[in-house]
């Protein structure tokens, strides 16, 4: 059986993962027109990769049922899709043919991702509120 604190831990892990996703989306949107980075070349879109970690695998949770998982960000990866080439011969980052490579960030796609992450975060908050209400109700019954 999943206890109150374990349920809160699961929900909190989801909130933390969505916060990382929102931060990467913000970085992508902030760099949508960055044609030169310190590493050289245009900014490359980044994406977090999530993994499920079973609570039964974590130290201190041996009594929990299998199948309950925390969410963790295992890594942040760079999107390998090519950027957009735009003919701008006067641009300082133009190549010999006059083309500038812009980041592989699609602002509309990022906005959709932001809405999805925001809704997932809201769902996590709702689950925490529900767990708190259940714990409160259980305490009231015990009185």
Stretches with model-predicted labels:
Residues 1-143:
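Amphipathic alpha-helical polymerization modules
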């Amino acid at each position: 059986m999943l206890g109150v604190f374990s349920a809160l831990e699961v929900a909190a892990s989801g909130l933390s993962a969505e916060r990382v996703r929102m931060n990467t989306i913000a970085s992508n949107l902030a760099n949508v027109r960055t044609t030169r980075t310190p590493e050289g070349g245009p900014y490359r879109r980044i994406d977090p990769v999530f993994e499920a970690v079973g609570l039964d695998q974590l130290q201190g949770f041996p009594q929990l049922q299998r199948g309950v998982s925390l969410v963790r960000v295992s890594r942040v990866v760079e999107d390998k899709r090519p950027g957009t080439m735009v003919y701008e011969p006067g641009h300082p980052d133009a190549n010999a043919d006059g083309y500038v490579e812009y980041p592989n960030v699609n602002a509309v796609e990022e906005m959709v991702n932001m809405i999805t992450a925001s809704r997932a975060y809201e769902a996590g908050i709702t689950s925490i509120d529900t767990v708190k209400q259940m714990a409160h109700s259980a305490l009231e019954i015990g009185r």
